[in-house]
């Protein structure tokens, strides 16, 4: 198998939920879920953390992830796009490990509801379809062809034109959940968008839709994890 790099990007300055990446959900720090899922997938020799926080780095190392650089300030503010952060982690990892990774898989630290099986199936889809990159999503609960609107000149207009009278008749749409990103090395180095001519989509269970950006998100995810009642070996 070609060597795959796993990255988990977790900055310390979260505004919506303070210290969310190391806040505990059912006795485990949130970032621990992604680290353990990566380990359980058996896809990776290296699980690398990109962070600007010494506290996050310490917690991540406790669970077996590797932290050998500190993310620079210009890549750690709330306006920084994620692709440059992943690209930085890839190049630093290649220099550190003296190897060239063919593929990078990034796991969002604030999306703990995925499983190791999700990671494996997403990678299998990526390989089978020979995608340049892959994003994950869930079936959308709202549809721009049917029940999403915009305001233009103080009037309501449909987000997408179309004569669809039921949700079932409208084109299927998907809500990106930011849980898993997969890139071929060359694509990541040469592009600044996740939308390319050969981008794949892996559809996940709707329960994985929650990316923790608010206290409400945190409470919902905490409840869903408690319902599953999983131990780390089941992640």
Swiss-Prot record:
GO biological process, alphabetically ordered: bacterial-type flagellum organization; lipopolysaccharide biosynthetic process
InterPro entries: CMP-NeuNAc_synthase, Cytidylyl_trans, Nucleotide-diphossugar_trans
Highest taxon in the source lineage: Bacteria
Catalytic activity: N,N-diacetyllegionaminate + CTP = CMP-N,N-diacetyllegionaminate + diphosphate
Organism ancestry: Bacteria, Pseudomonadati, Campylobacterota, Epsilonproteobacteria, Campylobacterales
Sorted UniProt keywords: Bacterial flagellum biogenesis, Nucleotidyltransferase, Transferase
Enzyme class, spelled out: transferase
Gene3D superfamilies documented for this protein: Spore Coat Polysaccharide Biosynthesis Protein SpsA, Chain A
CDD domains recorded: CMP-NeuAc_Synthase
Family: Belongs to the CMP-NeuNAc synthase family.
EC number: 2.7.7.82
Protein name: CMP-N,N'-diacetyllegionaminic acid synthase
MF-aspect GO terms: N-acylneuraminate cytidylyltransferase activity; nucleotidyltransferase activity
Reported function: Involved in biosynthesis of legionaminic acid (5,7-diamino-3,5,7,9-tetradeoxy-D-glycero-D-galacto-non-2-ulosonic acid)(Leg), a sialic acid-like derivative that is incorporated into flagellin via O-linkage to Ser/Thr. Catalyzes the conversion of N,N'-diacetyllegionaminic acid (Leg5Ac7Ac) and CTP into CMP-N,N'-diacetyllegionaminic acid (CMP-Leg5Ac7Ac).
């Amino acid at each position: 198998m070609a060597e795959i790099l796993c990255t988990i990007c977790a900055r310390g300055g979260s505004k919506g939920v303070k210290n969310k990446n190391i806040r505990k959900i059912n006795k485990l720090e949130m970032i621990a879920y992604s680290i353990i899922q990566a380990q359980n997938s058996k896809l990776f020799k290296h699980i690398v953390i990109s962070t600007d926080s010494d506290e996050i780095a310490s917690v991540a190392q406790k669970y077996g992830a590797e932290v050998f650089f500190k993310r620079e300030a210009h890549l750690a503010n709330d306006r920084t796009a994620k692709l440059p952060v992943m690209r930085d982690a890839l190049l630093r990892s290649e220099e550190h490990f003296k190897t060239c990774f063919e593929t990078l898989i990034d796991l969002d630290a604030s999306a703990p509801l995925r499983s190791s099986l999700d990671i494996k199936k997403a990678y299998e889809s990526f390989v089978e379809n020979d995608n340049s990159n892959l994003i994950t999503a869930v079936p959308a609960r709202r549809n721009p062809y049917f029940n999403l609107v915009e305001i233009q000149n103080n009037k309501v207009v449909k987000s997408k034109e179309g004569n669809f009278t039921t949700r079932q008749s409208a084109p299927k749409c998907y809500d990106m959940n930011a849980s898993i990103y997969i890139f071929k090395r060359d694509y990541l180095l040469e592009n600044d968008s996740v939308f390319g001519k050969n981008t794949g989509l892996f559809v996940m269970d709707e329960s994985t839709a929650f990316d923790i950006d608010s206290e409400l998100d945190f409470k919902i995810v905490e409840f869903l994890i408690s319902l599953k009642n999983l131990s780390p070996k089941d992640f």
